[in-house]
């Protein structure tokens, strides 16, 4: 019986039957014929000797016909001699019994093959295609009987109507099954040791490949306190650079100065300077472009709704599309408040909460950049509108940034008509409420730095010196 492992691979059996020489069983080999060793199981054609061989006395009433025909008579009709150059020559013996020739009244091989045969498997398409069809047309029919251990003679004595060469092919099947089961058992043992084994199909290509072997990590970091191990030397070399902080690839753009460990990181960074965005979102109606594949991957989660980063804090259960968002969210659970308002000193756990506080209580601050810059750029940490009373004709509005702008100041000169007055933070001498200041109007002043632009709402008067004088009078009255 064909094993379950070979049920989906019948081409192996066909290849074995067509290309393998099967030794004859005991009782079929002549003791005096030393040159006859095996029969080639190549596809049999209509002109071959096997197609014209029939067992004698093939009548419905014969019972022991197999015993009446000696095996020597069968083998004498087909004798294979091996020549000196290794070629097989087929020589017919002089004593050829005429009863082995097929008569017109003899039943066909297709009629001899019955579904109730006791054989384990029968190549039904052998007879359907003239015993010479290709491997892809072979069909293996499995019997309901499970007894496949009967030898050649017992199977032939049970049903002698099936030709003897089909019985030999059945023995070839049983031999192949036993050999394949042994190989599968061997592969199972070696597969447990981590080896990659697979059983190839008839065309020589692997059909099902096993799991990839897990390579041994032999490279271990020698830095104290680091237990990282690596498989590839390139990864190990990159890891050692992180310990030495060896950033040998520096951005050549003016005013940038960023450095990287590997050249590929620098190439990706240069896209931010030249505006190259090779990764595009192909969702309908979107079409956004990004500089890195990681940014595109994070953007696609907006369309799919995927949020793979889950907060593991007890009772929270929030999930995020990006790991950076999860990292910022974890600050809420830790109780840390690293973001401080530079005007009043109030601290916040999120930078967005601090920015909302500044826009609401200290100044009207907005961002007029693009949407992507608005999501990634940090707004101003704090600002102050200063006034120099000693120099009334040289007023200066200064905005100090301590976030992504690197602490540089944004200065606006030639603003003689602009006074540094805020909603709540006034200069020491201007303690009078803004509602009592005459002829005061709102103006928006735009300040730019790099890729960001800011609009600051300030108060102006028709005569700035008059506003300062009123502030002095108010101070004297108090």
Curated annotation (Swiss-Prot):
InterPro entries: Zinc_finger_trans_reg, Znf_C2H2_sf, Znf_C2H2_type
Location within or outside the cell: Nucleus; Chromosome
Binding site for Zn(2+) 1: 221, 226, 239, 243
Ranges in a coiled coil: none
Zinc fingers (C2H2-type) by residue: 219-243, 249-273, 279-303, 309-333, 339-362
SMART domains per the UniProt record, alphabetical: ZnF_C2H2
Residues annotated to bind Zn(2+) 5: 341, 344, 357, 361
Summary of subunit composition and partner proteins: Interacts with CDKN2A/p14ARF.
Name under which the protein is recorded: Zinc finger protein 410
Source organism of the structure: Mus musculus
Gene: Znf410
């Amino acid at each position: 019986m064909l094993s379950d492992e070979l049920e989906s691979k019948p081409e192996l059996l066909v290849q074995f039957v067509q290309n393998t020489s099967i030794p004859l069983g005991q009782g079929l080999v002549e003791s005096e014929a030393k040159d006859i060793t095996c029969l080639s199981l190549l596809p049999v054609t209509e002109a071959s000797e096997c197609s014209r061989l029939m067992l004698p006395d093939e009548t419905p009433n014969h019972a022991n016909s197999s015993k009446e025909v000696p095996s020597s008579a069968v083998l004498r009709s087909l004798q294979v001699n091996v020549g000196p150059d290794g070629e097989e020559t087929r020589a017919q013996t002089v004593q050829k019994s005429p009863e082995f020739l097929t008569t017109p009244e003899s039943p066909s091989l297709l009629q001899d093959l019955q579904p109730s045969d006791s054989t384990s498997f029968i190549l039904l398409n052998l007879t359907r295609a003239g015993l010479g069809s290709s491997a892809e047309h072979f069909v293996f029919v499995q019997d309901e009987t499970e007894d496949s251990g009967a030898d050649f003679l017992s199977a032939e004595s049970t049903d002698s109507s099936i030709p003897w060469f089909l019985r030999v092919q059945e023995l070839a099947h049983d031999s192949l099954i036993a050999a394949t089961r042994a190989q599968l058992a061997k592969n199972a043992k070696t597969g447990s040791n981590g080896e990659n084994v697979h059983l190839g199909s008839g065309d020589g290509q692997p059909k099902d490949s096993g799991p990839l072997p897990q390579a041994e990590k032999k490279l271990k970091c020698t830095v104290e306190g680091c237990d990282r191990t690596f498989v590839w030397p390139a990864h190990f070399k990159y890891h050692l650079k992180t310990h030495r902080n060896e950033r040998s690839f520096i951005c050549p753009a003016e005013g940038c100065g960023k450095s990287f460990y590997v050249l590929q990181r620098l190439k990706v960074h240069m896209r931010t300077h030249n505006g190259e965005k090779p990764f595009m979102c192909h969702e309908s109606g979107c079409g956004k472009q990004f500089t890195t594949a990681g940014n595109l991957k994070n953007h696609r989660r907006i369309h799919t709704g995927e949020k793979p980063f889950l907060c593991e804090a007890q009772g929270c259960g929030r999930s995020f599309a990006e790991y950076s968002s999860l990292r910022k969210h974890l600050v809420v659970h830790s109780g840390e408040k690293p973001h401080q308002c530079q005007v009043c000193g109030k601290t916040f756990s999120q930078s967005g909460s601090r920015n909302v506080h500044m826009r609401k209580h200290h100044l009207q601050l907005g961002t007029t950049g693009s949407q992507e810059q608005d999501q990634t750029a940090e707004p101003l940490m704090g600002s102050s509108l200063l006034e120099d009373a000693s120099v009334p004709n040289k007023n200066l509005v200064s905005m100090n940034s301590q976030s992504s702008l690197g602490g540089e100041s944004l200065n606006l000169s030639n603003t003689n008509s602009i006074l540094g007055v805020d909603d709540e933070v006034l200069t020491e001498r201007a303690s009078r409420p803004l509602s009592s200041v005459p002829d005061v109007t709102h103006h928006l002043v735009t300040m730019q730095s790099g890729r960001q632009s800011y609009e600051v709402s300030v108060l102006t008067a028709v005569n700035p010196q008059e506003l300062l004088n009123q502030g002095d009078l108010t101070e004297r009255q108090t």
